[in-house]
Swiss-Prot record:
Catalytic subunit of the tRNA-splicing ligase complex that acts by directly joining spliced tRNA halves to mature-sized tRNAs by incorporating the precursor-derived splice junction phosphate into the mature tRNA as a canonical 3',5'-phosphodiester. May act as an RNA ligase with broad substrate specificity, and may function toward other RNAs. PANTHER family: RNA-SPLICING LIGASE RTCB HOMOLOG. It comes from Sus scrofa. One of its GO terms (cellular component) is cytoplasm. Its cofactor is Mn(2+). The modification Phosphoserine is found at residue 300. This is RNA-splicing ligase RtcB homolog.
Length: 505
C-alpha cells in the first residue's frame, strides 16, 4: 500500500538550510537515517520527484532519489547514515550522488555493485598549462580538431595505444604504474591521482574473459554519454592559496579536463557481479527493499571477487585517463610546435566518482574500518590527511567537479567538516534533471550545438544525435550543486573554470 505525498512528508525533516533528514520508517527496515543536501532550487526538484511518484508516476525506470537513499539505509552493516549529495538523482539501485559506508568488522555488512555504478572509476582529471586564453583563442578550432583527431571518441571507439592481451592483464593489475612503465605517463602524474592511480587489491583473474574482450580495444578512448575532454580557462579564483598550490595563478590560464571511466570493461564487471550476487543473496538470506540493490557480504567469495574485479576495472580507468593525457599532451605540443614539458601540462589531480574503498573513519567517537561506497560522489579529504599528496597537505584534497557541455566546472577542496558529516565525500557534477529519453524528446541537437557556438565554444562531437542528452538543460545547475556543498561546509570552492572547447563522444 503506497502512502500519500502528505504521509511521506511526515518522515522528512529540515535540519538546516542545506540539509534534510529522512527518518526511519520512510521505507521498511531502515538501519540508520538518511540525509540529503540541497538548496532551495534543488530541494524543489527532489520533492517534485517524490510527489510525482506518489501520484503513480513512479512506474517505469527508477524509484525517486529520496526512496533510494532510504532503501540504502536498510542495507545490512550500514553505519552512521545514508547520504545524498546535492547532485543526487535516481539511478540503478543506489541513486547517483548517494554514498554509504559499511562496517568491515560486521560479518553481515555488504558490498553492492549498485553503490559503485556500472562505469567503475568514472572520474575526472585536470591538467594545467602555462598558456593564456589569448594564446589559445586564435588556434582554438585547430586545437579542438587536434584533440578530436588524437583521442578516439564515441560509442564503439577503438584505442590507438598498442595493446595485447598480456598488456591488458598488466594494466588491470598495475594501473598508472603500467602507463608509467610504457612511457604514457610522467612520474609526477601518479602523485596527483587518488590512490596514486593503482588499487592494490586488483586481481585481473576476477575480470571475466568477456569484460577483457570489451576492454582490450577501448583503452585510451573517451566513450560516449557524459564523457568529454574540455579545454577550459580559469574564470574565477576563490582560494588563491589553494590555487597556487595547484599551479593556477591567474584568471585566463588554460586547463584541460578529461572525464572518462572504464568503458565496456567496467560495465561487464558490474553486470557479472550482479548475476553472482543474486545467487549469494538467496544462499545467505539477505533481504533488500529493491532488487536492484543486489549485494553480497563483504567477506563472502562473491563480495571479495567483486572488490578485486572492481579494483582492476578502476586501474583500467586510470590507465585510460593516463592514455588520454598522453594524447592530449601530444595534440597540444603539435599545435604549439613545442613539447608538453614546455607547456607545463601537469596533472593537477585525478579523482574517481564511482568506486568503493576501504577507509578509516571516526564513527560515534571510535575509529572504524569501513567500506565506503561512492557513486556519483567524490572523495574530499581534509588538510593533513595521510592519503593525499604532499603538495596538497595544507590545502586539502583537490576535488574536480565537471559541468556539462557549455557550463562551468569547479575545483573544490576537502574539509574537516566533510570528514565528520559525509565520510570525506562531496558532489561530483551537476546531476541529471531530465532523463536521457526526455532530453531527446524535448531538445533538438542542432539548437544545442548552435547555442554552444554562440557562446564561443569550439565543439567536436562523434555522435551529434546524442548531444541533447548532455545539454545543460538536461542537468541541475552545477553552480547550485557546488554552492550547496560549500555552504554546508562539506567542501570549499577554490577555482571556477569555463569551457572554450568541448570534445565529446
Amino acid at each position: 500500500m503506497s502512502r500519500s505525498y502528505n504521509d511521506e512528508l511526515q518522515f522528512l525533516e529540515k535540519i538546516n538550510k542545506n540539509c534534510w533528514r529522512i527518518r526511519k520508517g520512510f521505507v521498511p527496515n531502515m538501519q540508520v537515517e538518511g540525509v540529503f543536501y540541497v538548496n532551495d532550487a534543488l530541494e524543489k526538484l527532489m520533492f517534485e520527484e517524490l510527489r510525482n511518484a506518489c501520484r503513480g508516476g513512479g512506474v517505469g525506470g527508477f524509484l525517486p532519489a529520496m526512496k533510494q537513499i532510504g532503501n540504502v539505509a536498510a542495507l545490512p552493516g550500514i553505519v552512521h547514515r545514508s547520504i545524498g549529495l546535492p547532485d543526487v538523482h535516481s539511478g540503478y539501485g543506489f541513486a547517483i550522488g548517494n554514498m554509504a559506508a559499511f562496517d568491515m568488522n560486521d560479518p553481515e555488512a555488504v558490498v553492492s555493485p549498485g553503490g559503485v555504478g556500472f562505469d567503475i572509476n568514472c572520474g575526472v582529471r585536470l591538467l594545467r598549462t602555462n598558456l593564456d586564453e589569448s594564446d589559445v583563442q586564435p588556434v582554438k578550432e585547430q586545437l579542438a580538431q587536434a584533440m578530436f583527431d588524437h583521442i578516439p571518441v564515441g560509442v564503439g571507439s577503438k584505442g590507438v595505444i598498442p595493446m595485447n592481451a598480456k598488456d591488458l592483464e598488466e594494466a588491470l593489475e598495475m594501473g598508472v604504474d603500467w602507463s608509467l612503465r610504457e612511457g604514457y605517463a610522467w612520474a609526477e602524474d601518479k602523485e596527483h591521482c587518488e590512490e596514486y592511480g593503482r588499487m592494490l587489491q586488483a586481481d585481473p583473474n576476477k575480470v571475466s574473459a568477456r569484460a577483457k574482450k570489451r576492454g582490450l580495444p577501448q583503452l585510451g578512448t573517451l566513450g560516449a554519454g557524459n564523457h568529454y575532454a574540455e579545454i577550459q580557462v580559469v574564470d574565477e579564483i576563490f582560494n588563491e592559496y589553494a590555487a597556487k598550490k595547484m599551479g593556477i595563478d591567474h584568471k585566463g590560464q588554460v586547463c584541460v579536463m578529461i572525464h572518462s571511466g572504464s568503458r565496456g570493461l567496467g560495465h561487464q564487471v558490474a553486470t557479472d557481479a550482479l548475476v553472482a550476487m543474486e545467487k549469494a543473496m538467496k544462499r545467505d538470506k539477505i533481504i533488500v527493499n529493491d532488487r536492484q540493490l543486489a549485494c553480497a557480504r563483504i567477506a563472502s567469495p562473491e563480495g571479495q571477487d567483486y572488490l578485486k574485479g572492481m579494483a582492476a576495472a578502476g586501474n583500467y580507468a586510470w590507465v585510460n585517463r593516463s592514455s588520454m593525457t598522453f594524447l592530449t599532451r601530444q595534440a597540444f605540443a603539435k599545435v604549439f610546435n613545442t613539447t608538453p614539458d614546455d607547456l607545463d601540462l601537469h596533472v593537477i589531480y585525478d579523482v574517481s566518482h564511482n568506486i568503493a574503498k576501504v577507509e578509516q573513519h571516526v564513527v560515534d567517537g571510535k575509529e572504524r574500518t569501513l567500506l565506503v561506497h561512492r557513486k556519483g560522489s567524490t572523495r574530499a579529504f581534509p588538510p593533513h590527511h595521510p592519503l593525499i599528496a604532499v603538495d596538497y597537505q595544507l590545502t586539502g584534497q583537490p576535488v574536480l567537479i565537471g559541468g556539462t557541455m557549455g557550463t562551468c566546472s569547479y575545483v573544490l577542496t576537502g574539509t574537516e567538516q566533510g570528514m565528520t558529516e559525509t565520510f570525506g565525500t562531496t558532489c561530483h557534477g551537476a546531476g541529471r534533471a531530465l532523463s536521457r529519453a526526455k532530453s531527446r524528446r524535448n531538445l533538438d541537437f542542432q539548437d544545442v550545438l548552435d547555442k554552444l557556438a554562440d557562446m564561443g565554444i569550439a565543439i567536436r562531437v562523434a555522435s551529434p544525435k546524442l548531444v541533447m542528452e548532455e545539454a545543460p538543460e538536461s542537468y541541475k545547475n552545477v553552480t547550485d550543486v557546488v554552492n550547496t556543498c560549500h555552504d554546508a561546509g562539506i567542501s570549499k570552492k577554490a577555482i571556477k573554470l569555463r569551457p572554450i572547447a568541448v570534445i565529446k563522444g
